[in-house]
């Protein structure tokens, strides 16, 4: 590619930023359409692929263009230690919504109700992909495809369905909302097509989502401890689901 920086600038506003080797690796592994990928050291990046991701090494060999460090730094908000970045096409919203709406899902949908922290949202998407969740949807103003979220998610947005919806647009299925006043989750079997909702750490569930919930559940927690990190709560809940046959 003769002018990767020029192509980058033309496409950046309409593409997903993959920031770092692991984000690019996961995106390629899960079928992302990558339109441009750059690195400051092509040989070192391909050696890293040989070591950590030999399955995607041929694809990275075809995609990566080496650029000078100042050029790379000009393309990203904050240089990544691996000095790798790429742009990919965002998956179809319509296809994601169709996938989320299926009534015979084999894994839960995670709902983040009005999340505030971009890093936490990315961490949830990363672990949801690891558990094979059908998808992660957010309500409120946070963009789940924000570059900081994608970076925190290590590119695993492409391994699951990630979208922003309203409470009225939540996927079908029994809605289990995590709330300190709910029943102990250890006494409940979560169905594979469950919709699992989590409020923000600061304000909890919104009134609209809480009113719509079919069941309120709580996580075991020592008295006088106020809350878990959002990603920790999601991980505990998905692990509980997985004990009955998930992942």
Where are these regions (language model features)?
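Active-site/ligand-binding-proximal alpha/beta "capping" segment
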Residues: 177-223
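Structured adenosyl-cofactor binding patch, chiefly the S-adenosyl-L-methionine
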Residues: 86, 127-131, 141-144, 148-157, ...
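Short, aromatic/basic amphipathic alpha-helical patches
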Residues: 44-59, 148, 208-209
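Boundary-proximal intrinsically disordered activation/regulatory segments immediately upstream
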Residues: 1-54, 141-142
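Amphipathic alpha-helical repeat scaffolds
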Residues: 20, 116-123, 226-231
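RNA substrate-binding interface of SAM-dependent RNA methyltransferases
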Residues: 87, 91-181
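Glycine/small-residue-rich loop that forms an oxyanion/phosphate-binding "nest" at active or ligand-binding sites
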Residues: 53-89
């Amino acid at each position: 590619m003769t002018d990767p920086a020029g192509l980058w600038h033309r496409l950046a506003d309409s593409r997903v930023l993959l920031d770092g080797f692991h984000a690019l690796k996961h995106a390629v592994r899960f079928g992302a359409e990558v339109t441009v990928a750059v690195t400051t050291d092509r040989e070192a990046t391909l050696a890293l692929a040989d070591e950590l991701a030999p399955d995607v090494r041929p694809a990275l060999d075809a995609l990566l263009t080496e650029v000078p460090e100042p050029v790379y730094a000009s393309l990203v908000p904050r240089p990544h230690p691996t000095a790798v970045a790429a742009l990919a096409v965002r998956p179809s919203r319509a296809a994601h919504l169709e996938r989320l709406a299926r009534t015979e899902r084999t894994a839960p949908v995670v709902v983040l109700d009005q999340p505030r922290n971009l890093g936490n949202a990315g961490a949830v998407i990363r672990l949801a992909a690891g558990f094979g969740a059908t998808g992660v949807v957010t309500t409120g103003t946070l963009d789940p495809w924000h570059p900081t979220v994608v970076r925190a998610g290590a590119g695993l947005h492409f391994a699951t369905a990630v979208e922003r919806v309203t409470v009225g647009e939540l996927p079908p299925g029994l809605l289990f909302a995590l709330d300190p006043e709910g029943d102990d989750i250890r006494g409940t079997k979560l169905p594979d097509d469950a919709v699992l909702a989590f409020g923000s750490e600061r304000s909890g569930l919104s009134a609209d989502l809480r009113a719509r919930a079919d069941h309120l559940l709580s996580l075991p927690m020592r008295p006088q401890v106020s809350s878990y990190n959002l990603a920790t709560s999601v991980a505990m809940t998905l692990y509980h689901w997985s004990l009955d046959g998930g992942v």
